[in-house]
């Protein structure tokens, strides 16, 4: 019963993060925050899986390293867009 709770809570939180990501598409910063929330829930699921299967824990550290790099890259893109366009609204600039 407890193991089912360990799997269902991160899955529910992941789905809530995806819902926020899909429904809140006006600002780039809110989208980046919801992406970081999704990555954090994926790390929680990975941590549970690695502890359950008794794998090595360095895979979790690699995942966190790549997610931090993804967050820094997203913030640098946001800063460059704010410098060129003046805000982080998606409607004010054409990315394509």
Swiss-Prot record:
Localization terms from the record: Mitochondrion membrane
Function (record text): Core subunit of the mitochondrial membrane respiratory chain NADH dehydrogenase (Complex I) that is believed to belong to the minimal assembly required for catalysis. Complex I functions in the transfer of electrons from NADH to the respiratory chain. The immediate electron acceptor for the enzyme is believed to be ubiquinone.
Keyword Transmembrane annotated: yes
Any one GO MF annotation of this record: NADH dehydrogenase (ubiquinone) activity
Chain ranges passing through the membrane: 2-22, 28-48, 58-78
PANTHER family registered for this protein in UniProt: NADH-UBIQUINONE OXIDOREDUCTASE CHAIN 4L (PTHR11434:SF0), NADH-UBIQUINONE OXIDOREDUCTASE SUBUNIT ND4L (PTHR11434)
Gene Ontology terms: cellular component: mitochondrial membrane; NADH dehydrogenase complex
Name of the top EC class for this enzyme: translocase
Keywords: Electron transport, Membrane, Mitochondrion, NAD, Respiratory chain, Translocase, Transmembrane, Transmembrane helix, Transport, Ubiquinone
One of the GO BP terms on file: ATP synthesis coupled electron transport
Reaction(s) this enzyme catalyzes, per UniProt: a ubiquinone + NADH + 5 H(+)(in) = a ubiquinol + NAD(+) + 4 H(+)(out)
EC number per UniProt: 7.1.1.2
Protein name (Swiss-Prot/TrEMBL): NADH-ubiquinone oxidoreductase chain 4L
Superkingdom: Eukaryota
Family indicated by similarity: Belongs to the complex I subunit 4L family.
Topology of the protein relative to the lipid bilayer: Multi-pass membrane protein
């Amino acid at each position: 019963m407890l193991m089912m709770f360990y799997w269902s809570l991160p899955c529910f939180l992941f789905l809530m993060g995806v819902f926020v990501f899909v429904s809140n598409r006006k600002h780039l910063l809110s989208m980046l925050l919801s992406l970081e929330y999704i990555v954090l829930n994926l790390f929680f699921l990975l941590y549970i899986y690695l502890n359950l299967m008794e794998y090595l824990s360095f895979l979790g550290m690699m995942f966190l390293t790549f997610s931090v790099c993804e967050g820094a890259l997203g913030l640098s893109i946001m800063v460059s867009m704010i410098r060129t366009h003046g805000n982080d609204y998606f409607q004010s600039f054409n990315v394509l």
